[in-house]
């Protein structure tokens, strides 16, 4: 009985931390469900049936997202492959194993089967997906030093420990299904509008009304998606700082700082517009560098 209580307490704490850390993804999922529910109910005379259908779709999407299939789908979309060549294995795997070992020492509950993958994208990037996937772009491998790559890997493992990577998988799957539902609804609305117009004596008025309804629906969806992007971006920016903190905790703060300096030096994007800033998933790189420098300077003073 005590073991059961301990398990439930531990599980409750983990769920609570996940909910608190990923409130934006949960809110975004709720909004997806609401809009998809309204869209399906518009095509059904039975509201209860529409709600059941929407709930069933979301159960399937979440089931796919949290399964290995969800990670496989996203890896396939990014054309990610395991580290295969002898040169890449000899270079990258020792770096990853060093960082991974430190992460496991800090967080024993971290998945023991995380695998490193490579995408042939030329931009400098690294990201975590689900529970078992860390990806490096070819651009990062070619442009960053071994120590800088360690910093990037440590940062991504930080995302995994907080559940960010799993929440992102669920969000991507939800977005995909939502977009599909919206597309189907728009096509059906358009077809019904044309049919109704052809059979109506006031076909011109019917066409105009159908066009207005279609336009309002499209703009409402666009506004909803933009609002959702802002909510997710706001949450993501705060999560980036926490992943930086994790890299620092496991001993790779200096390496990550140098990684960010390198990324900042190669950033040719210029100033962000207001729209770009609202939808940006990462804070300004210089702000992250300054934050890490403060931590490292305090550490030097203490020791």
Describe the predicted segments one by one.
Residues 148-149, 168:
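Conserved catalytic/dimerization core of cyclic nucleotide/dinucleotide signaling enzymes
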């Amino acid at each position: 009985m005590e073991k059961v209580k301990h398990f439930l307490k531990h599980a409750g704490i983990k769920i609570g931390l996940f909910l608190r850390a990923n409130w934006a993804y949960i809110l975004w999922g709720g909004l997806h469900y609401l809009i998809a529910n309204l869209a399906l109910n518009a095509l059904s005379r039975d509201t209860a049936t529409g709600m059941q259908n929407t709930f069933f779709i979301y159960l399937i999407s979440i089931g796919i997202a949290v399964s290995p299939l969800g990670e496989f789908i996203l890896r396939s979309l990014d054309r990610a492959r395991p580290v295969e060549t002898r040169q890449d294995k000899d270079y990258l795997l020792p770096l990853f194993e060093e960082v991974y070992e430190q992460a496991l020492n800090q967080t024993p509950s971290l998945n023991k089967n995380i695998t490193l993958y490579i995408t042939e994208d030329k931009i400098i990037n690294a990201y975590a997906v689900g529970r078992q996937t860390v990806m490096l772009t070819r651009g990062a491998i070619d442009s960053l030093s071994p120590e800088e790559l360690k910093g990037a890997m440590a940062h991504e493992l930080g995302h995994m420990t907080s559940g960010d990577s799993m929440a992102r998988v669920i969000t991507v799957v939800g977005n995909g299904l939502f977009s599909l539902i919206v597309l189907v609804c728009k096509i059906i609305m358009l077809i019904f509008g044309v049919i109704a117009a052809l059979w109506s004596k006031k076909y011109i008025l019917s066409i105009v009304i159908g066009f207005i309804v279609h336009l309002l629906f499209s703009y409402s969806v666009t506004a909803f998606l933009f609002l959702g992007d802002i909510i997710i971006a706001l949450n993501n920016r705060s999560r980036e700082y926490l992943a930086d903190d994790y890299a620092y905790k496991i001993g790779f703060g200096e390496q990550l700082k140098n990684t960010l300096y390198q990324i900042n030096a190669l950033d040719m994007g210029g100033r962000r517009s207001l729209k770009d800033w609202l939808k940006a998933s990462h804070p300004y790189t210089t702000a992250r560098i300054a934050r890490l420098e403060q931590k490292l300077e305090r550490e030097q003073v203490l020791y």
